[in-house]
Amino acid sequence: MPEFSTIVYAVTDQVARITLNRVDVRNAQDKAMLYELNDAFDLAAQDDGVKVIVLDANGPHFSSGHDLADQTTMADFQPVSNWGGYGKPGAEGYQSQEEEIYLGLCWRWRNLPKPTIAQVHGKVIAGGLMLIWVCDLIIASDDATFSDPVVAFGVNGVEYFAHPWEMGPRKAKELLFTGEKITAEEAKTHGMGNPVVPAQE
């Protein structure tokens, strides 16, 4: 089994649990975490003893989004797609990276051959939505909130492409234009989530 430093992987009673574990940065996703998530999803998908995959997080919040302080480059990792051009200057190189670590990985995870469940609590911000959208079911604690404030600080986000699919175009535009938080109960009414459960459970 691979060694993980940004997540925790465990299998109990045919359930693989993948836990985000960068608590000090509120589980912000750097490239290392994304590739470890990919390895963990592959591990669970290929394990005949695993029937269901659960994605959750340690700490007070599910995820604060992408780690904007990540200084690693694509040369530090082994790509899993056939995209190229990561080292090219400007927009071309940046787009290549986005295709691999955001769009490409998410596409792989959406197509896992086993049921996936996101178990979320606390804040789910921007890139945190990217992680839960790929799951078949989303179970939220009653203290969970969802937001995507990236428009407010002028950053593009691949999550944009999934928001209309997950909650409908009008609610997606409201979420992006205002940057306001959506509660777990409100998220459920817009089709963004499934059961809402008490945080202590």
Functional labels for PLM-detected ranges:
Residues 1-16, 62, 70, 74, ...:
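C-terminal alpha-helix plus adjacent terminal tail
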Residues 18, 55, 67, 131-133, ...:
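Hydrophobic/aromatic residues within transmembrane alpha-helices
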Residues 32-36, 101, 108:
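Charged catalytic carboxylate motif
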Residues 25, 57-105:
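Glycine- (often His-adjacent) and acidic-residue-rich active-site loop
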Residues 34-36, 69-73, 157:
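Glycine-rich, phosphate-binding/catalytic loops in enzymes
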Residues 107-201:
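Crotonase-fold acyl-CoA enzyme core
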Residues 1-58:
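Conserved CoA-thioester-binding segment of acyl-CoA-metabolizing enzymes
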